Swiss-Prot record:
Belongs to the universal ribosomal protein uS9 family. The keyword Cell membrane does not apply. Pfam families: Ribosomal_S9. The gene is rpsI. Keywords: Ribonucleoprotein, Ribosomal protein. One of its GO terms (molecular function) is structural constituent of ribosome. This is Small ribosomal subunit protein uS9.
């Protein structure tokens, strides 16, 4: 079994640090349980998807520290961190993780506001005459 693997995931402004160790299924997110921090079942399923590829979810303990961004950004950042931690544990499932898109860092970020415009792309009203 594994001693401990640590990995980081990012999405927009959200940064997540995930510690994966063998245990009995205890998941700690910023000092709270997974159900308290991420109340929606969809969010929890998204986060735990890479761990399900290893098999038994309850044979691992997770300690997650996440900060910045919104809730969905934190969910995707945590999923990426968990997928990287799982990859350190089991190298042979890399192709499966990659096929599911769990190892892909989403590069999209907020576009900066340009001068002479209201927002990043929105201009002031233009009058031809």
């Amino acid at each position: 079994m594994i001693q401990e693997s640590v990995a980081t995931g990012r999405r927009k402004q959200a940064v997540s640090s995930v510690r994966l160790r063998s245990g009995n299924g205890k998941i700690d997110v910023n000092g709270k349980t997974l159900e308290q921090y991420f109340p929606l079942e969809v969010q929890r399923a998204t986060i735990l998807a890479p761990l399900r590829m290893l098999g038994d979810v309850n044979s691992f303990d997770l300690i997650i520290r996440v900060s910045g961004g919104g809730v969905q950004g934190q969910v995707i950042a945590t999923r990426l961190g968990l997928a990287r931690a799982v990859l350190q544990e089991k190298e042979d499932i890399k192709q499966e993780l990659k096929a599911q898109g769990f190892l892909t860092r989403d590069p999209r970020k907020k576009e900066r506001k340009k001068y002479g415009r209201k927002k990043a792309r929105k201009s002031f009203q233009f009058s031809k005459r």
